[in-house]
Amino acid sequence: MTESAMTSRAGRGRGADLVAAVVQGHAAASDAAGDLSFPDGFIWGAATAAYQIEGAWREDGRGLWDVFSHTPGKVASGHTGDIACDHYHRYADDVRLMAGLGDRVYRFSVAWPRIVPDGSGPVNPAGLDFYDRLVDELLGHGITPYPTLYHWDLPQTLEDRGGWAARDTAYRFAEYALAVHRRLGDRVRCWITLNEPWVAAFLATHRGAPGAADVPRFRAVHHLLLGHGLGLRLRSAGAGQLGLTLSLSPVIEARPGVRGGGRRVDALANRQFLDPALRGRYPEEVLKIMAGHARLGHPGRDLETIHQPVDLLGVNYYSHVRLAAEGEPANRLPGSEGIRFERPTAVTAWPGDRPDGLRTLLLRLSRDYPGVGLIITENGAAFDDRADGDRVHDPERIRYLTATLRAVHDAIMAGADLRGYFVWSVLDNFEWAYGYHKRGIVYVDYTTMRRIPRESALWYRDVVRRNGLRNGE
């Protein structure tokens, strides 16, 4: 450990109060000029994920995405995460950039393959050292670290043993989570166990890693949730706030002629994860479907582990799901056979969805799952903007984010218990099977690794400083 790291550790906890200061009794407001103010203590942040930005693929462990992205035909244009944004070597410069852009909280993920390269057994000190340095750098610049423990990057050895379809993976996750907490827990207060387990269980079977169409998907769902529940044991190890991040989408039926389909799709897309984690039971629709797809062992006892208190529910929002009244079914989601969708269910809606869907979703979550604070852990849009010298104009992104934040403000005014917002993403990055074609609020020249803040990054800096939107935005 360096001297600077020891100094930063001695002052541990600096900045953590920002996330701990959740909204209590403070209301969002609109002033006479039409400006929109967010609640006192509202959390403003930005997000990334390890495999999407770190690079350094030959250093400190190999994950399933390293293998998948090197498989011909799996990723657009043959892109890989070998170098990505080279954040592994440039993290200090990136943190200084974030500080200059006014970021207060940074959501990142820890790469499991760097910490426990074989999935179980010895912990890799070099992997922990990297995140140790990253956390100290963040705190040194007044930025609160907000790590996610699993963002789809599974050690390849565990994938070879069955991945999340194997029950043992949940227990290996708990061991890994404890190892990370032992190293970082003296300075990190808030933790997210899993990011978008729906993607790891379903989307991975044909678009993302591992790409195996015969994965027992509902068994993987259950084991991901079990891993989340086992990860919540960090509370007894001293963790402050613990949460789970889900990708959630309102389901819209085209017309009454699609009766019944909407509730079934909502159960598969949303309640399949919400209900076990927050209510201690699976939706009846999912139980019926599971009966034909998975043998879960002892789900009753497992649900006691899965259903433990969480401090925050992270919401990743990009799109709604709209059912069509006509046309052929176009999806590969088990349990939704015969239901027609306006677009394939597995495709993330880029560049950006209608923001009013987010308002609807936040109000529904606060109504159906009271007592759990909400935080938007990802939201953003991708547009085909290009650098023009030292500037990158992206007015479409600014318009989208403005409309989204207005919808978010409306939801708070209507009673949603929303406590924060993380824009996706800080940097252009490796967008999984899409390669490098999606974009963040900071432009990255992948030849020189130069970073150029887009106009949206400067706009977002002003939003954070004002804790709100000006009239006319």
Curated annotation (Swiss-Prot):
The record's section on InterPro entries has: Glyco_hydro_1 (IPR001360), Glyco_hydro_1_AS (IPR018120), Glyco_hydro_1_beta-glucosidase (IPR017736), Glyco_hydro_1_N_CS (IPR033132), Glycoside_hydrolase_SF (IPR017853)
**Which terms does the record give in the GO molecular function aspect?**
beta-glucosidase activity
Its predominant location is cytoplasm
Q: Which domain of life does the protein's organism represent?
A: Bacteria
**Among its keywords, does the record have DNA repair?**
no
Q: Which GO terms describe its cellular component?
A: cytosol
**How does activity fare over a range of temperatures?**
Thermostable, retains about 70% of its activity at 60 degrees Celsius.
Q: What positions constitute the catalytic site? A: 196 (proton donor), 378 (nucleophile)
Where it sits in the cell: the answer is: Cytoplasm
Task: Cite the SUPFAM superfamilies for this sequence.
Answer: (Trans)glycosidases (SSF51445)
Q: Which GO terms describe its biological process?
A: cellulose catabolic process
Record flagged with keyword Hydrolase: yes
Q: Which UniProt keywords apply?
A: Carbohydrate metabolism, Cellulose degradation, Cytoplasm, Glycosidase, Hydrolase, Polysaccharide degradation
Q: What reaction gets catalysed by this protein?
A: Hydrolysis of terminal, non-reducing beta-D-glucosyl residues with release of beta-D-glucose
E.C. number = 3.2.1.21
Q: What else is known?
A: Shows greater activity against cellobiose than against aryl-beta-D-glucosides.
Q: Which PANTHER family match?
A: GLYCOSYL HYDROLASE, LP05116P
Q: Which family does it belong to?
A: Belongs to the glycosyl hydrolase 1 family.
Q: Tell me what this protein is called.
A: Thermostable beta-glucosidase B
In which organism is this protein found?
Thermobispora bispora
> Gene name on record?
bglB
